Amino acid sequence: MKNYHDIVLALAGVCQSAKLVHQLATESRADSETFLTALNSLFITQPQRIEDVFGGEVRHLKLGLETLIHQLNAQGDQNLTRYWLSLLALEGKLSKNSDAKQTLGNRISRLKEQEIHYARDSETMLSIMANIYSDIISPLGKKIHILGSPDYLRQELVQNKIRAVLLAGIRSAVLWKQMGGTKWQILFFRRKLLATAKQIYSSIY
């Protein structure tokens, strides 16, 4: 039997990354706590439970749950829809590429070693995360076309933040697949996903 609670949390993680990308592209900034939650998820590779990936508490996925609920209600921004569905598609490509998976695992291990020297949200770490996305994930499939302010999208720091958040989105997409998530559920069990997302969201104080 599918654990829709965990599937929805992982999918909310994907949607949260999509929302952060939109914020960065249109405003050059993102909610700081939610941004850190996304970055931190890259460092939690052996969680005891799914909540551990997102700071140990469901409240850290509030923005993602809000976004997911709007998306499942067909009320969401079309660009957001494109972002999170593209992340799921890239995860599908990654799951079939053993070389890319191994390289990604090695690069994430090296990323974790850099914590000794740099804060996770430092420009150096963001650059490393962005390079991991550009080197390994981006070549796997169709590039995600980000829409926003040209002035912001030209800034290297904003570019690195967006790619780092996209990498976190891939982390959540991998988790979604591990929890039993499938695209068929999004098509045929949308009401179940929506009801579960609303139930989880209502538990956040």
Swiss-Prot record:
It is a peripheral membrane protein. It is found in: Cytoplasm; Cell inner membrane. Keywords: Cell inner membrane, Cell membrane, Cytoplasm, Membrane. Gene3D superfamilies: HflD-like. InterPro entries: HflD (IPR007451), HflD-like_sf (IPR035932). The keyword Cell membrane applies. The keyword Transmembrane helix does not apply. GO terms for cellular component: cytoplasm; plasma membrane. Belongs to the HflD family. This is High frequency lysogenization protein HflD homolog. It comes from Haemophilus influenzae (strain ATCC 51907 / DSM 11121 / KW20 / Rd). The gene is hflD.
